[in-house]
């Protein structure tokens, strides 16, 4: 199905950020939800040499909020807010300085709290990147609307991404392929933020029965997922019947945290129907890892 969008009315602007170093945290040990203290690798920011969209979101030893790829931000607060607002998932990213100058990648997601943007590059590009390298993004997607579905609000989504997500219609509603469902009772860190346009919200994996019921062991970075009974139109609000679609941007975390979801589509009236599809992943839909041996979901 061809989505009717107002993309011809959207402004495309250039924003830029610098590759940020991985960040430390006071104290080496942190307590996991099961009560076991661990020395954790702080997984946000920096350059990940062997973690990319399409890889498992869980199972990485001693990691907290592990993100894929490369993260960028700006040292100036106002400029960083602009970067986080205007960069949209699926936008083109171009290395503007350093040894990898001219190489291209893709915007994957945005992370609240640290306020940075996550990018995907091919492994051979990653090897030539350094902290401080500047990345420019052709920001396109702010103001996007679905003309036939006014209740469904796109957020942080490049129009080209929505065209590749295999979205359809059924009985007057959008059908969106996702890998997993997330019930409202799991939503954790991020609730209370006034806007879903510039970050993410976590869902908790601390209950073993729920973890097993929803099959989260197969969760992958870049998976498209559906949050049930949550409306992200004006912040993260519980509302029965609402449905939100987002992308997994990081792995598990300490109590109250968990894998993060950057919002792509939300409907307070529930005019989105999630359809389970194990292949509903950012890397798969955009063909980012063609030629690589495909690993099975666990």
Task: Describe each region flagged by the PLM.
Residues 1, 295-298:
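Short, Lys/Arg-enriched, disordered terminal segments
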Residues 1-2, 9:
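Ser/Pro-rich intrinsically disordered low-complexity regulatory regions in eukaryotic proteins
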Residues 11-295:
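Conserved mixed alpha/beta catalytic, RNA-binding, or beta-rich assembly cores of soluble enzyme
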């Amino acid at each position: 199905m061809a989505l009717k969008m107002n993309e011809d009315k959207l402004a495309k602007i250039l924003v830029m950020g610098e590759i940020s170093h991985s960040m430390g945290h006071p104290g080496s040990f942190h307590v996991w939800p099961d009560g076991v203290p661990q020395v954790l690798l702080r997984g946000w920011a920096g350059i990940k040499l062997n973690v990319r969209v399409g890889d498992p979101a869980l199972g990485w030893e001693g990691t907290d909020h592990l993100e894929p790829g490369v993260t960028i931000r700006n040292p100036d607060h106002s400029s960083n807010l602009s970067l986080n607002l205007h960069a949209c998932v699926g936008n083109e990213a171009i290395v503007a300085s350093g040894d990898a100058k001219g190489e291209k990648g893709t915007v994957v997601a945005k992370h609240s709290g640290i306020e940075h943007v996550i990018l995907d590059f091919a492994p051979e590009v990653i090897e030539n990147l350094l902290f401080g390298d500047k990345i420019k993004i052709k920001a396109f997607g702010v103001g996007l609307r679905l003309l036939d579905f006014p209740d469904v609000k796109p957020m942080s989504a490049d129009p080209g991404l929505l065209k590749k997500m295999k979205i359809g219609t059924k009985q007057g509603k959008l059908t969106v392929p996702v890998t997993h469902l997330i019930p409202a009772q799991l939503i954790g860190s991020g609730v209370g933020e006034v806007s879903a346009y510039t970050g993410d919200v976590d869902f908790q994996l601390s209950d073993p029965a729920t973890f097993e019921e929803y099959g989260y062991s197969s969760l992958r970075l870049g998976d498209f997922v559906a949050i049930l009974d949550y409306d992200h139109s004006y912040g993260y609000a519980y509302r029965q019947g609402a449905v939100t679609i987002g992308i997994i941007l990081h792995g598990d975390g300490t109590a109250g945290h968990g894998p993060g979801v950057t919002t792509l589509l939300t409907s307070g009236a529930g005019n989105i129907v999630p359809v389970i599809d194990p292949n509903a992943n950012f890397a798969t839909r955009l063909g980012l890892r063609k030629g690589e041996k495909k690993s099975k979901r666990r």
